[in-house]
A protein has these predicted regions:
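Hydrophobic N-terminal alpha-helices or hydrophobic patches in metabolic proteins across all domains
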Residues: 1-216
Length: 216
């Protein structure tokens, strides 16, 4: 099959058309969201007078979750105060001193990713009640992955502060977009469209049987 004919056949396939349309919605949602986020005061016109409270709440979740994981899995010595991690070690005189400080700020709250996921769900195909339920579940997944991200970055920062910025910008940040893409893919694959019902098999009793006498 020639390439143009293959492309035409692929596009004319109804399933491929749906997938292409939903993928375009993913791209449009991402572009529109980032344009609005960076060029408007999106946080204020979404949350109004509750903006600071909303960000404080989700930042506290990220900080508390990261702190719990640090206390459980990290081998570093640190002190926590006011959403900050103070990493300590003994100096030459044997006294404990802080050698690095990491603060969990509003940008670490994952609200941006949740809002992007919300816009994506609004534009995606599917029933609204299903999208509402999936948005709540997907937002929880984003929050949990963000806590894991905070923990990994905090532990990395305590071990090697000089490597932190690179991994923050080029590893940890893209991971959150991978999570959003995975949530979109699961939605499209399993929830966006109603599965076609299989044709009910005919009742065998209604079919003529070779064992029964047939009228001439």
């Amino acid at each position: 099959m020639k390439e143009p004919q293959f492309i035409k056949t692929t596009i004319e396939n109804p399933k491929n058309r749906k997938l292409l349309k939903d993928f375009l919605m993913l791209v449009v949602a991402s572009v529109v969201f980032h344009f609005l986020y960076w060029n408007t005061d999106m946080n204020s016109w979404l949350f109004g007078p509750f903006t600071d409270r909303v960000f404080d709440f989700f930042t506290l979740i990220a900080y508390t979750g990261g702190k719990m994981l640090m206390n459980t899995f990290s081998s570093l010595d640190f002190v926590c105060e006011n959403s900050s991690f103070y990493f300590i070690q003994p100096n030459e005189q044997g006294q404990l001193q802080c050698y690095a400080t990491m603060q969990i700020i509003h940008d670490c709250s994952a609200i941006k990713q949740i809002m992007q996921f919300l816009l994506l769900m609004v534009l995606c195909s599917g029933k609204w009640w299903k999208k509402a339920i999936y948005f709540v579940g997907g937002s929880l997944v984003i929050v949990l992955f963000n806590i894991l991200r905070i923990y990994l970055l905090t532990d990395l920062f305590g071990h090697n502060p000089l490597q932190f910025q690179y991994y923050h910008d080029w590893v940890a940040r893209p991971i959150m977009y991978v999570v959003i893409f995975a949530l979109w893919a699961v939605w499209i694959q399993f929830f966006a469209y109603s599965k076609p019902k299989d044709d009910c098999p005919q009742d065998k009793r209604s079919l003529p049987s070779s064992d029964l006498p047939m009228a001439d």
